[in-house]
Amino acid sequence: MDLRPCAPAESRKRTEYSDRQECQKGKDMIRKAVFQDEEQIAVVYEKARAYMAEHGNPNQWGRTFPPRELTHEDIEKGILYVLEEQGEVHGAFMFEIGEDPTYHVISEGAWKSDEPYGVIHRVASDGKVHGLMKETVAFCSSQISHLRMDTHEKNLTMQHQLLRNGFEYCGVILTHDHTPRLAYEKL
């Protein structure tokens, strides 16, 4: 896949694909999600939940995470991105530059840097397009080189992908509901 970051449109409405022409190179692209993507994103999340359950991780997202309200809110904030191929959404992730409150306290280790960072959450794929994590990391790294992520201890696929894509294990953080997550960082 040949993807490049989308330049933000100043007066973009979240109901239009206003950055499609700027971002597309070849047939694949990463772009900001818009409200029309919500149904396809819900399908991607459903497939990701099924994959996690089949691979020994049924509890990280359960049966309903992320809720549609969170997807809608992320689109509204302009922090939800999709991987699109030939007009179909095959992956999604949340990316935001700035502090994540759940990363303020880390145990069983330490962060490598206190410099500003971008955080990636809720990476999901429908399994039809390979290389989503690589493209996600490349896209986010083009925005800010310092990245942080976390994952469930039973999400072995994501742990492998994080290490494969240059992240280092740093310790354990607690989510908003106080469940532990393995924390990773890429400088």
Model-predicted segments: where are they?
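A short beta-loop-alpha structural element at the N-terminal edge
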Residues: M29-V43
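Conserved GNAT-fold acetyl-CoA-binding loop/helix
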Residues: R49-E69
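A short helix-loop-beta-strand connector motif used in the catalytic cores of GNAT acetyltransferases and
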Residues: L70-V82, E99-P101
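Conserved beta-strand in the GNAT
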Residues: V82, E88-G98
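Conserved acyl-donor/pantetheine-binding loop and adjacent beta-alpha core of acyl/acetyltransferases
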Residues: M94-K128
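Conserved acetyl-CoA-binding loop-helix of GNAT-fold acetyltransferases
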Residues: S125-S142, H160-R164
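Conserved GNAT acetyl-CoA-binding A-motif
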Residues: S142-K154
